[in-house]
Swiss-Prot record:
Ribonucleoprotein among keywords: yes
Assembly, per entry: Component of the 60S large ribosomal subunit (LSU).
Protein location: Cytoplasm
PROSITE patterns linked to this entry: RIBOSOMAL_L13E
Organism per entry: Ictalurus punctatus (Channel catfish)
GO cellular component: cytosolic large ribosomal subunit
Primary subcellular site in the record, as a coarse category: cytoplasm
GO molecular function terms noted in the UniProt entry: RNA binding; structural constituent of ribosome
InterPro entries assigned to the protein according to its UniProt record, in alphabetical order: Ribosomal_eL13 (IPR001380), Ribosomal_eL13_CS (IPR018256)
Similarity remark: Belongs to the eukaryotic ribosomal protein eL13 family.
Keywords: Cytoplasm, Ribonucleoprotein, Ribosomal protein
Protein name, UniProt field: Large ribosomal subunit protein eL13
Known role: Component of the ribosome, a large ribonucleoprotein complex responsible for the synthesis of proteins in the cell. The small ribosomal subunit (SSU) binds messenger RNAs (mRNAs) and translates the encoded message by selecting cognate aminoacyl-transfer RNA (tRNA) molecules. The large subunit (LSU) contains the ribosomal catalytic site termed the peptidyl transferase center (PTC), which catalyzes the formation of peptide bonds, thereby polymerizing the amino acids delivered by tRNAs into a polypeptide chain.
Length: 211
């Protein structure tokens, strides 16, 4: 048994014909080939749809440790789809992932993903179900002929860093304590309801005293 994490180093006493029970991994090269062939078969099967699958939203990682990073999420919220003017049932049929459980907790995330949906919709080549009778929103014959299968990720997420010029640190910035401010902000958010309730009760008591 291989040592796992920070535990005691094992000293196994092998008996019982242990050579027969050795786990081998000689099937890995064949597995690699099998996975590759499966990917190619899927790409042929879903063509001309993108190989990478449906469009995913831009989300922030959870917790204070990772919330500065953005990555691809599971699916767009119903609020984002509504703002972009796309029906939630139609969205899945045109290559947009939908996750009804996710919630928008900031207007910034909502605007970013709505814009992403609009850009995707403008670039999308939608094949008509009946070539003889195309519906509203379907692409023209010329656009359909131009269509090729996308091999990379659909609208890859670009992480942009704003470069700032070097400058002197001000006295105000030197005095600023980021950790204490974050703790205070969290405490204020946590105690908001209790403080509001106490203030309301105090105001009611003042009114009663004046009577």
């Amino acid at each position: 048994m291989a040592p796992s994490r920070n535990g005691m180093i094992l000293n196994p006493h092998f008996h019982k014909d242990w050579q027969k029970r050795v786990r081998t991994w000689f099937n890995q090269p064949a597995r690699k080939l099998r996975r590759r062939k499966a990917r190619q078969a899927k790409a042929r099967r879903i063509a001309p749809r993108p190989v990478a699958g449906p469009l995913r939203p831009i989300v922030r990682c959870p917790t204070v440790r990772y919330n500065t990073k953005v990555r691809a999420g599971r699916g767009f919220t119903l609020e984002e789809l509504k703002a972009a003017g796309i029906n939630k049932r139609v969205a899945r049929t045109i290559g947009i992932a939908v996750d009804p459980r996710r919630r928008n907790r900031s207007t910034e995330s909502l605007h970013v993903n709505v814009q992403r949906l609009k850009v995707y919709r403008s670039k999308l080549i939608l094949f008509p179900r009946k070539v003889s009778a195309p519906k509203k929103g379907d692409s023209t014959e010329e656009e359909v002929k131009m269509a090729t299968q996308l091999t990379g990720p659909v609208m890859p997420i670009k992480i942009v860093h704003k470069k700032e010029k070097a400058r002197m640190i001000t006295e105000e910035e030197k005095k600023f304590n980021a950790f204490a401010n974050l703790r205070m902000a969290r405490a204020n958010a946590r105690l908001f309801g209790i403080r509001a309730k106490r203030a309301k009760e105090a105001a009611e008591q003042d009114v009663e005293k004046k009577k």
